[in-house]
From Swiss-Prot:
Name the record gives this protein: SsrA-binding protein
Family the entry assigns: Belongs to the SmpB family.
Gene Ontology cellular component list: cytosol
GO BP: any one term: trans-translation
Keyword presence, Cytoplasm: yes
Chief location bin: cytoplasm
Subcellular location per the Swiss-Prot or TrEMBL entry: Cytoplasm
Function: Required for rescue of stalled ribosomes mediated by trans-translation. Binds to transfer-messenger RNA (tmRNA), required for stable association of tmRNA with ribosomes. tmRNA and SmpB together mimic tRNA shape, replacing the anticodon stem-loop with SmpB. tmRNA is encoded by the ssrA gene; the 2 termini fold to resemble tRNA(Ala) and it encodes a 'tag peptide', a short internal open reading frame. During trans-translation Ala-aminoacylated tmRNA acts like a tRNA, entering the A-site of stalled ribosomes, displacing the stalled mRNA.
Molecular function per GO: RNA binding
């Protein structure tokens, strides 16, 4: 199974603690697929909502296809996510808990189809973000010291 990541939401890993991930199909038009092949997507402000038993991706941006004509797609439109019923029920029960939300983490190609990796996330507090930065800096310094010692 070949998986090629197109766009990732790096801000999500900084602002949220990812508890569980799901892979979902997405309903796209032809020009949206062509634009994603050119890496023309952005998941910065995007989120997922569940209404009437269907999952929808909102505020995601897929740039208009540069060779498209007048029938090009809207950049920020509502896009339907394709999930199994039990996955939708699981996500819906998780989101009903206080403080949890569903955030798209990445677009990727799997067997020629565009998929979205979504995560059930809890927001980080500012002190948690600082703690993560301090931890990352310590690991960098440790790796640099190890590298110097092997020379």
């Amino acid at each position: 199974m070949s998986v090629k990541e197109i766009v990732s939401n790096r801000k999500a890993f900084h602002n949220y603690e990812v508890l569980e991930t799901f892979d979902a199909g997405i309903v796209l038009t032809g020009t949206e697929i062509k634009s994603l092949r050119d890496h023309g997507g952005n998941l910065g402000d995007a989120y997922v909502t569940i209404s009437k038993g269907e999952a929808w991706l909102l505020q995601s941006s897929i740039a208009p296809y540069r060779f498209g004509n007048i029938n090009n797609h809207e950049e920020r439109r509502k896009r339907k996510l394709l999930l199994h019923k039990y996955e939708l029920q699981k996500l819906d029960s998780r989101v009903s808990q206080k403080g949890l939300t569903i955030i798209p983490l990445s677009f990727f190609f799997s067997k020629g189809f565009v998929k979205v990796r979504i995560g059930c996330c809890r927001g980080k507090k500012s002190h948690d973000k600082r703690q993560a930065l301090i931890e990352r800096e310590k690991n960098r310094e440790l790796a640099a010291a190890m590298k110097r010692s092997y020379r």
